[in-house]
């Protein structure tokens, strides 16, 4: 088994990671590092964390054998880790609970977050409602338009949603504005970052909270494989979509020592890797500093961040978590691209063959799993992290498919009738 101990004490994964933040945030980051070091192995903290995951989130999430899909691909058996079944509909809640528990212990009454697809924003608003914390969510104005159901969910849960009009009006810009808020309100505010990026300790901390995904898989997969008469304890490949990369790192990390299992991250190739309209930082980016850490980013020859594109708001980001950059460099993980069209086709295919509506982000991982399965034997296996459900995306998919999503009698202006139940 591979020996793997990352990051180092300063938050570096090889030459990536670290902490590149303004002097104003130095004290806040030191305070956060000390708090996490104090509680990360504290029995009472961990007991509460796992209790919340079990009773509030509904963990462990099941693994499902996609039998019909596997049969139609004619190769490897495909298994889905059903993070879409979590409370709030995605993997994001795992990390948010852990960070919100830290916020309470640190005496921070106000929480801020950034969001792209809206799932991290919904998860943050949810746990702030549960814990009685003020919640402000920054979201790119473009994402506000394409993820309107999640915007309304956040507001229902009591959050203030701030549309960000600067730059490309997507996730990168939302993160920039959240950082500015944190600088201005550092004394009473806790910033819950939603991915394995940002200055140390965020990449490590988010990974640790999300690693419950892979830890469960290590326990679940032997039985699932035995049920299909596959003589193995681990899958031949683990596949997950990668934007910032938290769902991927959550399922990858416990598998890193198991060298016979391939770890495959799927980036958003958009309109094609050579089109200039994609979000594939690891395949078309270069090393640089973004949002407080050194990683692979999409930048021009002058070091300016270039605009990105993806059909999925959650993958529309010009960087990636530093641990992913390190895993690629040492050859432990590999990264591929899936286009908008391939992801959309996989979205429809999973709906119609397995009765599961996946998030567009997750559809990228499903699409590559379908491609890979055809090249493997029927006694081999693929585990896909189905990171979220697609309810939030049906408006986008309908638009792209030429369907009038709102073709129904209007309910606007209709009074709600009836009084209290007798």
Swiss-Prot record:
Reaction catalysis annotation: (1S,2R)-1-C-(indol-3-yl)glycerol 3-phosphate + L-serine = D-glyceraldehyde 3-phosphate + L-tryptophan + H2O
Cofactor: pyridoxal 5'-phosphate
EC assignment: 4.2.1.20
Keyword hit for ATP-binding: no
Keyword check for Amino-acid biosynthesis: yes
SUPFAM superfamilies: Tryptophan synthase beta subunit-like PLP-dependent enzymes
Alphabetic keyword roster: Amino-acid biosynthesis, Aromatic amino acid biosynthesis, Lyase, Pyridoxal phosphate, Tryptophan biosynthesis
GO cellular component: cytoplasm
Domain of life: Bacteria
CDD domains referenced in this protein's UniProt entry, alphabetically: Trp-synth_B
Annotated pathway: Amino-acid biosynthesis; L-tryptophan biosynthesis; L-tryptophan from chorismate: step 5/5
A Pfam cross-reference name: PALP
Self-association state and partner proteins as the record states: Tetramer of two alpha and two beta chains.
Family membership: Belongs to the TrpB family.
Name used for this protein in its record: Tryptophan synthase beta chain
Gene behind the chain: trpB
